[in-house]
């Protein structure tokens, strides 16, 4: 499914060129992963949907990353906790995402739920990472989880994303290791999702 060569799409700096590569190389892989992920997600009694990023508002600059989001809502995902599989120029990531679009209406409710799952987050493998913005390629140790919740509560453009990132060149790119790792991450994050949904 995914290959180390997928990162080469980011070498094309033009909007049209990169978008064509995203549509022809990456989006089909997102759809293929969705065919694996959706049956697993649908076992919880909810119907889940895959939302592949279209980048329709882009008119000048090529996107620095692209993604597919999984949510139990056919019309959208940003206003709900959801899962997100994406690719940057140097890594593929899979996150349980609570994005800024839930603010301000749901801030108090979701931050309380995020605090309640802190023990579950601490049980995740040490290799799991935390991001505070799905549009910035920077991650943190899970030890900063509580700080990230406080930041989410007080900073307008902040998010809480928990999951895995697989760096370009990682040995997992050989064989099926990457898909297995992404599916395992989803299964490990599902109990947390169930508590914050």
Swiss-Prot record:
Pfam families xref list: DUF1054
Gene3D superfamilies on file: Protein of unknown function DUF1054
Domain of life: Bacteria
Database matches in InterPro entries: UPF0637, UPF0637_domain_sf
Similarity-based family: Belongs to the UPF0637 family.
Name of the protein in its database record: UPF0637 protein LEUM_0496
Source species: Leuconostoc mesenteroides subsp. mesenteroides (strain ATCC 8293 / DSM 20343 / BCRC 11652 / CCM 1803 / JCM 6124 / NCDO 523 / NBRC 100496 / NCIMB 8023 / NCTC 12954 / NRRL B-1118 / 37Y)
């Amino acid at each position: 499914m995914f290959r180390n060569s997928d990162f080469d799409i980011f070498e094309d700096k033009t909007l049209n060129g990169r978008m064509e590569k995203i549509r022809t190389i990456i989006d089909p892989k997102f759809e293929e992963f969705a065919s694996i992920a959706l049956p697993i997600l649908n076992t919880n009694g909810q119907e889940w949907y895959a939302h592949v990023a279209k980048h329709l508002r882009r008119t000048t600059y090529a996107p620095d990353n692209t993604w597919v989001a999984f949510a139990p809502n056919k019309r959208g995902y940003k206003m709900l906790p959801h899962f997100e599989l994406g690719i940057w120029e140097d890594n593929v990531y899979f996150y349980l995402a609570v994005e800024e679009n839930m603010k301000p209406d749901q801030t108090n409710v979701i931050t309380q739920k995020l605090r309640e799952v802190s023990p579950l987050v601490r049980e995740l493998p040490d290799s799991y990472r935390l991001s505070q913005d799905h549009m910035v390629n920077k991650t943190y140790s899970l030890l900063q989880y509580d700080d990230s919740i406080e930041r989410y509560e007080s900073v307008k453009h902040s998010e809480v994303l928990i999951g895995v990132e697989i760096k370009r060149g990682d040995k997992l790119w050989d064989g099926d290791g990457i898909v297995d790792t992404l599916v395992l991450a989803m299964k490990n994050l599902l109990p947390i999702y169930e508590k914050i949904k």
